[in-house]
């Protein structure tokens, strides 16, 4: 349908009037929240952790030296506006086929798009267009990070997928590299947000990895937006 000049201005004004929500997290909790939020007239930006190192994501980040695509894939699917079959295809996980076992097709597509566009950020941007995403999806950084946890017994456990299974109380968590730079667009999103949501998800493995990026943490602390955290 073609919009007249007046209709187009009304649509643009309607979008400008929407509350801007910046949501930080990873894992399945974030995707569940986004599926509900996209049904409402709000301007959503999801900023997704790049600390995942398990399963298909971990294999691709190790073999191809790219940020882990799994959490991003789930968020893209949650915010997509496509036929159900297309989303099912994007989320399909191979159960046989040798080296393909365990891989999600969406992860492989994001890896391929990273090769085509030259970096992970632009891959996510292009896939957002392909999937007609409602809102915006940003990786917290354009490179992978490793999450570490210092336990009460003094042990340092490395890897987001390994930390929960250690079974000891966590004293602190930190990233390597420590001086990782966020995607610049993330800073603009934080500064322009009316509401900042952290989570839902695991405090140590889904929420804190984003806050351990120094500039993201500083910008959230200084942002005038209302802030809420949903930690498990």
Q: How would you name each of these model-derived features?
A:
Residues 143-200:
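Active-site gating loop/helix substructures
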Residues 42, 223-228:
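A short helix->loop->beta-strand "cap" motif at the edges of active sites that frequently abuts
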Residues 5-14:
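Short, Lys/Arg-enriched N-terminal segments with co-localized hydrophobic residues
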Residues 13-66:
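Gly/lys/ser-thr-rich phosphate-binding loops in alpha/beta enzymes
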Residues 22-23, 197-199, 228-230:
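Structural motif
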Residues 189, 212-223:
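Catalytic-core regions built around general acid/base machinery
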Residues 51-168:
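Electropositive, gly/pro-rich neighborhoods at or near active sites that engage anionic ligands
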Residues 201-213:
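Glycine/threonine-rich flexible loop motifs
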């Amino acid at each position: 349908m073609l919009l007249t000049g007046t209709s187009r201005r009304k649509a643009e004004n309607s979008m400008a009037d929407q509350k801007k929500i910046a949501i930080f997290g990873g894992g399945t909790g974030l995707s569940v929240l986004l599926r509900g939020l996209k049904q409402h007239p709000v301007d959503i930006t999801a900023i997704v952790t790049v600390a995942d190192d398990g399963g298909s994501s971990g294999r691709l980040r190790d073999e191809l030296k790219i940020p882990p695509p799994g959490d991003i894939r789930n968020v893209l699917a949650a915010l997509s506006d496509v036929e159900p079959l297309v989303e099912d295809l994007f989320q399909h996980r191979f159960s046989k086929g040798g080296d393909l076992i365990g891989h999600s097709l969406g992860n492989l597509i994001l890896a391929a798009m990273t090769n085509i566009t030259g970096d992970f950020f632009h891959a996510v941007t292009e896939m957002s267009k392909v999937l007609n995403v409602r809102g915006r999806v940003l990786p917290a950084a354009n490179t992978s990070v490793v999450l570490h946890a210092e336990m009460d017994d003094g042990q340092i456990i490395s890897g987001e997928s390994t930390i929960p299974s250690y079974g000891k109380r966590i004293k602190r968590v930190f990233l390597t590299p420590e001086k990782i730079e966020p995607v610049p667009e993330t800073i603009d999103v934080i500064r322009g947000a009316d509401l900042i949501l952290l989570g839902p998800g695991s405090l140590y493995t889904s929420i804190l990895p984003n806050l351990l990026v120094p500039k993201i943490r500083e910008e959230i602390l200084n942002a005038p937006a209302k802030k809420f955290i949903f930690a498990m």
